[in-house]
């Protein structure tokens, strides 16, 4: 795979946000390894409550595997066309099976807090996610919380891809059981979304307009439009 990056097409974040459209069809041109790593690293740098990072990502690039994934994704052509499809997942058991230990180790490595704080982190995280009602009552269940966290990370990847000059298509249309079977995803892991990355073939969707801020953003109380 070529290592060259088409830096001439890089955008500012503002340009990426304003100009992004869901890409309907992709060229087969590969995404260079160094650009892909930048995209993935951006997602791994996303905010995460308690630094738990419940997200997991399966990067699908092989032609045959993309074709199989397409069948599990409601036969969407872009899944097979895009040179890279990132399958965003949420690990519902990671914090119980090693992630919490790694969080503490990383905190120690980076000089974050002392032993008392690390002990408190371990206790508080375990208590929070073991509490009746799950997630301390802040979410209907742990899967909902992990899904939210994973979407933040995947969206961050999407913006980095757009900044680097690539086109993207986030997708929620798939059969989770089929995606899991195709990719060998474990039972305690949820498939959250798919993100196709590449260069568009033809035109993107035309801009269809967005609600005015006064319709969707309120000041201080619900229903009070922001000035």
Regions found by a protein language model. Name each.
Residues 1-227:
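Acidic, surface-exposed loops and disordered segments
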């Amino acid at each position: 795979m070529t290592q060259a990056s088409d830096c001439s097409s890089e955008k500012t974040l503002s340009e990426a946000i304003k100009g992004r459209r869901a890409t309907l069809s992709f060229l087969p041109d590969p995404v260079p390894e160094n650009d892909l790593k930048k995209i993935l690293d951006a997602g791994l740098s996303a905010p995460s409550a308690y630094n738990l990072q419940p997200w997991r990502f399966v990067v699908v690039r092989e032609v045959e595997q993309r074709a199989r994934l397409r069948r599990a994704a409601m036969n969407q052509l872009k899944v097979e066309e895009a040179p890279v499809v990132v399958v965003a997942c949420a690990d519902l058991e990671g914090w119980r099976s090693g992630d919490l230990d790694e969080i503490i180790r990383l905190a120690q490595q980076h000089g974050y807090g002392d032993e008392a704080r690390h002990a408190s982190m371990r206790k508080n995280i375990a208590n929070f996610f073991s509490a009746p009602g799950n997630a301390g009552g802040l979410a209907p269940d742990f899967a909902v919380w992990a899904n939210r966290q994973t979407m933040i990370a995947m969206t961050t990847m999407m913006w980095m891809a757009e900044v680097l000059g690539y086109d993207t298509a986030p997708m929620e249309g798939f059969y989770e059981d089929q995606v899991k079977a195709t990719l060998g995803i474990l039972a305690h892991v949820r498939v959250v979304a798919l993100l196709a990355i590449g260069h568009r073939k033809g035109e993107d969707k035309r801009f269809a307009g967005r609600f005015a801020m006064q319709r969707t953003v309120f000041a201080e109380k619900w229903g009070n439009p922001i000035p």
